[in-house]
Amino acid sequence: MVIVAVTSLLTPFFQSRSDLRPEHDIPETTQIATNDSSSNQTAGTLIMPTTIDIVSTTSAFPFVQRWVAQYENQQLASSGSVNVDYLADREISVAEGGSGRLSDLAIVGVPGKNNNSMYIPVSAQAVAVVYNIPSFPDVPSGLRLNSTTLLLILNGSITQWDDAAIKDLNPSLNLPDQRIVVVHNGGDNSDSSSSSSLVLLNQYLGHPNSIWPKNDSIAASGPAELAEMVRKIPYSIGYVDFSYAVQTKMTYAAIGDGNGDYIVPSMQSIGHSVDIALQVHNYSTDRSPSQVQQPPPPTINASRIVSDSYPIVGLYYASLSAIDDDKQEEEGRRRIVAMLDFVKWLITESGGQQTLLEVEYPPIYPGNEQLATYAKITIDTIQKSLII
């Protein structure tokens, strides 16, 4: 449990959090403090234990579960208490985009449309094309696949591993005379239910919708089962978030870019894609703070991805609900304060960004002043909308 004070709203964006510790002499349920400049007397702010609910797209599970655990551990060490309840069994579809959810915060792979949520990037997102060829080593062996060949495999037009199109890309590999088994997410059957991983994959393929092979495909219930199936089924192929591929030590392909180079997903190649292809839309500077309008969320512009950059890359976002009348009640305000505290931790270099290294994702905030400014203004906008 971690206690977060309302005064945390006023702390600088990347400020050390040691000043959030409560006074030991103050009663547990009521800490009243005000700062009277004329008398130099301090009385306190109401500090109450707060629980926030978090949901995420299932593809983000490997690092979101780490975020929640490490945030609570770090805050316990500093005598605070926000209880973060991660509803890991609830999937967020692309159509939802975090809107209409029964939670305080959602981690999503695609910003929703036609809702009032605000989106702050929290991590890179990359899709690994994973496969199981028993005669190949159980490490990233670098089977080469380009967008044309991969599309033909996934739609069932190419059915054999030793097809001429695959052999042309991999002349040094002894490809087996075996049928290809395509494993896909069972929910990836329409635009309204597609996972963010499939959205990114289809963007790379240049094909808006996926048509899975009728006779040689298997539907998994989600990314965890998809990864497990590919590991168990010989001669299978599928797609998962890179963090799942790393966590389960899967074999994944080197993917062709527009220049004819083949890039294996890694912290370096994903980070390079983010560095060169991140597109941040600036806030308008000619408005008063109360009139600031949220620009479109930052995105990865695929057309900017060049050599040495993994081509199937996007972003994960913290989807923050717009402030409504219900959230202006005392309990609602405290939950928003706690939620913003968690989001601030996610994007700090020593907090959530450091945690990403455990799944071989690159931190996206260190050295990126434009992205940090975007996040700060977004958080400030929400804070100013609160009635304290």
Residue spans for each PLM region:
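Flexible loop/hinge segments at secondary-structure junctions
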Residues: T11-I388
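Hydrophobic membrane-insertion alpha-helices, especially the h-region
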Residues: M1-L9
